[in-house]
Structures are given as structure tokens and as C-alpha cells.
């Protein structure tokens, strides 16, 4: 795997609040190797460790992107939904930011059928196909379209299972993590001091509550993905 210097600055991580963990009474002992100290009842993460894991994660996604692999970003907490969609769109990734539907990966054949219906309704609406229906029929189809788009809009063009899944908030996204484990899909997960780092392939010890922390981490990962995609399209790599 090709390794790159990602110029990760500790001062930027400090400004983003990446180092703030949870209250000490809520900690998971498995996170002990990643904790630097305790301050006023709150665990402070070791940013040297965090930088190392982010670099490892960036190397992984860069190489995967350069090989044309597909990514799925998952984060369904309402206050970070816009961060997930924005980062995913910027890096041309799929995303889930409203609610994880059980079986979204492990029952992919069913999800595929729903996606086909969503695509069909999108095309029908775009072509004016709903305009010739009665108000009642049009309202029913628009309701179906709205609901499907809310849950599946971020994976509208996902034709196969993702190659790598990036997850924010381990506790909230446990179902997604378990599905990835069942299917042996590699995961990168932001893990705060109350999380279990053993549940993911590459844990990134970091504050999973502050928007500034999540934005900074997503920026690092999506930058690596974009650079990997550019590398795969460069003339010397297309021969």
C-alpha cells in the first residue's frame, strides 16, 4: 500500500477540538491506549495516536480510490447530517445521513429493488409523468418518492455493495458496523473514549460529538479520496 505524507497538523486538530473525549465515568477501558490524560472529569485523547490512525486511514482510502473502489459514508445524527452529505458529494461517495435501514447491506437485493423504484419515480417526475395523473394518484407517488429519497437518496446511484464504509458515531451506527462485519467490508470509524476500537478495521480516536472535529476528520479523508481518484485518472496511470 502506497504511503503519503498527509501533512496532519496537531495545532489544527486542537483548534477543531478533536482531542476532547467523554466524561471519565463513561469511558471504555479498551480506549486506554489512546487516552493522553484526564482533565476536570473529561478524558483527553492522545493526538499523536489520532494522527497516526488518520494517516493510515488516508493511505487506505487513497489507494482504494486510485483503484476505482467505492465508498459509503454513514452518520445519521441530525446535527451532522449536512456534514456527511457535503463530504460525500464533494468526494463523489455514497452516503446515509438520515436513518440506517436494517439490512441495507446484508439484504442488498431488497434495497436494490427499492432503489430501482426510486430511480423510476425520479425519471417519471422529471419527464412530467406525474402531471397527467389525478391529484390523489400524484400525491401518493410524490409521497413515495419523498420517503424513498429521504432514506435512500444518498445511495441512489450505488449499484453494488461499497468497498469501504466510513462511519461517524459508533454507538448510533452499530447496526451498520455489524452488517459490515458480516459481509467483511472494511470500516473506518471515528471512536470516542466511550467506544470499542476493536469493532472497526481502522479506528480514529477522536471527538465524535463536535461538528468542528467531525468536519476536520471528514475533510482529511475526502481529500485523500479525491487525490486517489485524480491519481487513477492521470495519463501515466491510464496506460
UniProtKB/Swiss-Prot annotation:
GO terms for biological process: translation. PROSITE patterns: RIBOSOMAL_S2_1. Transmembrane segments: none annotated. The keyword rRNA-binding does not apply. It comes from Psilotum nudum. GO terms for cellular component: chloroplast; mitochondrial small ribosomal subunit. The lineage of its organism: Eukaryota, Viridiplantae, Streptophyta, Embryophyta, Tracheophyta. One of its GO terms (molecular function) is structural constituent of ribosome. This is Small ribosomal subunit protein uS2c. It is found in: Plastid, Chloroplast. Belongs to the universal ribosomal protein uS2 family. InterPro entries: Ribosomal_uS2, Ribosomal_uS2_bac/mit/plastid, Ribosomal_uS2_CS, Ribosomal_uS2_flav_dom_sf. Keywords: Chloroplast, Plastid, Ribonucleoprotein, Ribosomal protein. The keyword Ribosomal protein applies. HAMAP family: Ribosomal_uS2_B (MF_00291_B).
Amino acid at each position: 500500500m502506497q504511503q503519503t505524507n498527509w501533512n496532519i497538523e496537531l495545532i489544527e486538530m486542537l483548534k477543531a477540538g478533536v482531542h476532547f473525549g467523554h466524561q471519565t465515568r463513561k469511558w471504555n477501558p479498551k480506549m486506554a491506549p489512546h487516552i493522553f490524560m484526564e482533565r476536570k472529569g473529561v478524558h483527553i485523547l492522545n493526538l499523536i495516536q489520532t494522527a497516526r490512525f488518520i494517516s493510515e486511514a488516508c493511505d487506505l482510502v487513497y489507494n482504494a480510490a486510485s483503484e476505482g473502489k467505492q465508498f459509503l459514508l454513514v452518520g445519521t445524527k441530525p446535527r451532522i447530517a449536512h456534514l456527511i452529505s457535503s463530504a460525500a458529494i464533494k468526494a463523489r461517495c455514497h452516503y446515509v445521513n438520515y436513518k440506517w435501514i436494517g439490512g441495507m447491506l446484508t439484504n442488498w437485493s431488497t434495497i436494490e429493488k427499492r432503489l430501482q423504484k426510486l430511480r423510476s419515480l425520479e425519471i417519471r417526475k422529471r419527464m412530467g409523468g406525474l402531471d397527467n395523473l389525478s391529484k390523489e394518484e400524484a400525491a401518493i407517488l410524490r409521497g413515495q418518492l419523498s420517503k424513498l429519497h429521504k432514506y435512500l437518496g444518498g445511495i441512489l446511484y450505488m449499484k453494488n455493495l461499497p468497498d469501504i464504509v466510513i462511519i461517524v458515531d459508533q454507538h448510533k451506527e452499530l447496526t451498520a458496523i455489524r452488517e459490515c462485519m458480516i459481509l467483511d467490508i472494511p470500516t473506518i470509524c471515528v471512536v470516542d473514549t466511550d467506544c470499542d476500537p476493536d469493532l472497526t478495521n481502522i479506528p480514529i480516536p477522536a471527538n465524535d460529538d463536535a461538528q468542528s472535529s467531525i468536519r476536520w476528520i471528514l475533510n482529511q479523508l475526502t481529500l485523500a479520496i479525491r487525490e486517489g481518484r485524480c491519481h487513477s485518472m492521470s495519463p501515466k496511470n491510464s496506460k
